């Protein structure tokens, strides 16, 4: 069996879909369906069982046996970069992750987890090294701290001549694609621009968006990276982006091209995001490629075109 936490979320449900596509259906999805709209992400997927996050954690902490587990994809987290309740964030993203990690280590279960490019902050160098990390929000800090916890485990194991079972962290950059409709304000720019055009409006970007460049990665490519590491058993913390930064304008142009209408409008940059907003991200893929991962990534034009074709039928 494979366990996917956050399995009703965007990346988690797409991982379940990718597993289904290679013939794997023995999957336990763990999530919190308090936001009941997420159920739509699971309707067309084949899984063995569903379990509430709190019930799952209770069983993990009790050391309960789930039977043979081939791998755990830990995508479950509070992913709102605008959430400033640090107690809640650290409990969800740090403490819970440690519990599950140690459960997997004790049983030598491969543990593949979601980190984030939010760990980097304002740097212009995006290498998986401590000197380039400096989160701008408590979400990024929760991910940064868990990465550092994993690093300490590796260091301790090395000092004692031990080898740990597989731990693989993925620093997701700006992920977009199907199954994100439940995310509200945290959904991708492509999602919001598409909805604006469908509502008869022009697509709207923040003032200065022509200067804001991000590494936008299509969720299908994120899944390919996850499955490659599951199948090849490589440990480490790796960037999961395309290696290319493209502007928000390019995203808007791709959405406009799909619809054949619309002109970009600019709106004022929100006060609450000033000082906590990454204006530039671009994954350094040196470490990913050195590990042997040869997944090819879609450009914004290619990925948004595929996304629009799926969501607009």
Curated annotation (Swiss-Prot):
Pfam families: Epimerase (PF01370)
EC number: 5.1.3.20
Biological or metabolic pathway of the protein: Nucleotide-sugar biosynthesis; ADP-L-glycero-beta-D-manno-heptose biosynthesis; ADP-L-glycero-beta-D-manno-heptose from D-glycero-beta-D-manno-heptose 7-phosphate: step 4/4; Bacterial outer membrane biogenesis; LPS core biosynthesis
Textual note on the cofactor: Binds 1 NADP(+) per subunit.
Residues annotated to bind substrate: 174, 185, 192, 206-209, 214, 277
Keywords per UniProt: Carbohydrate metabolism, Isomerase, NADP
Cofactor: NADP(+)
Catalytic reaction annotation: ADP-D-glycero-beta-D-manno-heptose = ADP-L-glycero-beta-D-manno-heptose
One MF term in the entry's GO annotations: NADP binding
Paired cysteines (S-S): none
InterPro entries (alphabetical): Epimerase_deHydtase, Heptose_epim, NAD(P)-bd_dom_sf
Listed GO biological process terms: ADP-L-glycero-beta-D-manno-heptose biosynthetic process; lipopolysaccharide core region biosynthetic process
Residues bound to NADP(+): 10-11, 31-32, 38, 53, 75-79, 92, 143, 175, 183
Active site: 139, 183
Role noted for this protein: Catalyzes the interconversion between ADP-D-glycero-beta-D-manno-heptose and ADP-L-glycero-beta-D-manno-heptose via an epimerization at carbon 6 of the heptose.
Description of its domains: Contains a large N-terminal NADP-binding domain, and a smaller C-terminal substrate-binding domain.
Family the entry assigns: Belongs to the NAD(P)-dependent epimerase/dehydratase family. HldD subfamily.
NCBIfam families tied to this protein: heptose_epim (TIGR02197), PRK11150.1 (NF008360)
Oligomer and partners: Homopentamer.
Protein name, UniProt field: ADP-L-glycero-D-manno-heptose-6-epimerase
Species of the source: Vibrio vulnificus (strain CMCP6)
Gene coding for it: hldD
